[in-house]
Amino acid sequence: MLITPEKLYKQRRNFLKLGAGALISSSVLASKLSALNFTSDTNPNKLEISDEELATNYVNFYEFSTDKRKAVSLAQNFNTQNWKIDISGEIEKPLTLSMEDILKFPLEERIYRFRCVETWSMVVPWVGFELRRLIEMAKPTSEAKFVKFTTLLDKSQFPDQDALFPTIDYPYVEGLRMDEAMHPLTLLAVGMYKKALKPQNGAPIRLVVPWKYGFKSIKSIVKIEFTKEQPKSTWESYAPSEYGFYANVNPNVSHPRWSQANERALGDFFTKPTLMFNGYEKEVASLYKNMDLKVNF
């Protein structure tokens, strides 16, 4: 079930165009976000939005650190000036987008559930635009079956990338099937809580796929590639018996080391049952018709 109703989540809130040659910094984006005319009732189901302080400070961003609190601290000097996103692969013509280009897409707020594979969860008001808008602009060919995403590789900014023994292989890579990428729930986010994304939350731009575990929602994207073959995602490569390509939230498929049947919302003491597809079963179940979700996890 959608948290934000169709009528509201399809409303578009446009940014004013920035002047030619302007640098797109977090502070500039924050000022644009604060000027947006958000509607007062974007959560008619009255689900409790997670505390902003908790949601922005309890994070997984291994490029900075495997320690959630330390990652927040180390992220504070992250430089996103002059950010570029290369778009390539099975498309009519490769292109590079600046954040100025990105901010030309109509932005909107969407309130989504977010479920981590570690069994914690939250409800976040994201600001962004549907990924399919960018895909339509890129004009993929009939050969494009998947979309591959890559996080920034910069050892000068990411301590774990520069470590003698990095925690995982970098750069971080994720992927979606084309129909998943084109689904209207799939979002490219530039903000949350009506503010620009903080560095630890994936600034300046990240993916949000609300029916999948959080590790699919790749942060700080610098490359989007359209491919013929299914890309090998980072966690799938690291531990294929524990992390599958699809990573759909499924209370009936346990992680090898823990159950996924329940979750604990940030700030709560008690757990609650995990919803199939994180509560978006009606919207996305048809994408996986006739698939064995215990095999394709």
From Swiss-Prot:
It holds the Pfam family Oxidored_molyb. One of its GO terms (molecular function) is metal ion binding. Its EC number is 1.8.5.-. The keyword Iron-sulfur does not apply. One of its GO terms (cellular component) is periplasmic space. Predicted to be exported by the Tat system. The position of the signal peptide cleavage has not been experimentally proven. Binds 1 Mo-molybdopterin (Mo-MPT) cofactor per subunit. One of its GO terms (biological process) is protein repair. Residues 1-35 form the signal peptide. Its cofactor is Mo-molybdopterin. Mo-molybdopterin binds at residues 62-63, 116, 151, 201, 206, 217-219. It catalyses: L-methionyl-[protein] + a quinone + H2O = L-methionyl-(S)-S-oxide-[protein] + a quinol; L-methionyl-[protein] + a quinone + H2O = L-methionyl-(R)-S-oxide-[protein] + a quinol. The keyword Cytoplasm does not apply. It is an enzyme of class 1 (oxidoreductase). CDD domains: YedY_like_Moco (cd02107). Keywords: Metal-binding, Molybdenum, Oxidoreductase, Periplasm, Signal. It is found in: Periplasm. Part of the MsrPQ system that repairs oxidized periplasmic proteins containing methionine sulfoxide residues (Met-O), using respiratory chain electrons. Thus protects these proteins from oxidative-stress damage caused by reactive species of oxygen and chlorine generated by the host defense mechanisms. MsrPQ is essential for the maintenance of envelope integrity under bleach stress, rescuing a wide series of structurally unrelated periplasmic proteins from methionine oxidation. Heterodimer of a catalytic subunit (MsrP) and a heme-binding subunit (MsrQ). Belongs to the MsrP family. This is Protein-methionine-sulfoxide reductase catalytic subunit MsrP. It comes from Campylobacter jejuni subsp. jejuni serotype O:2 (strain ATCC 700819 / NCTC 11168).
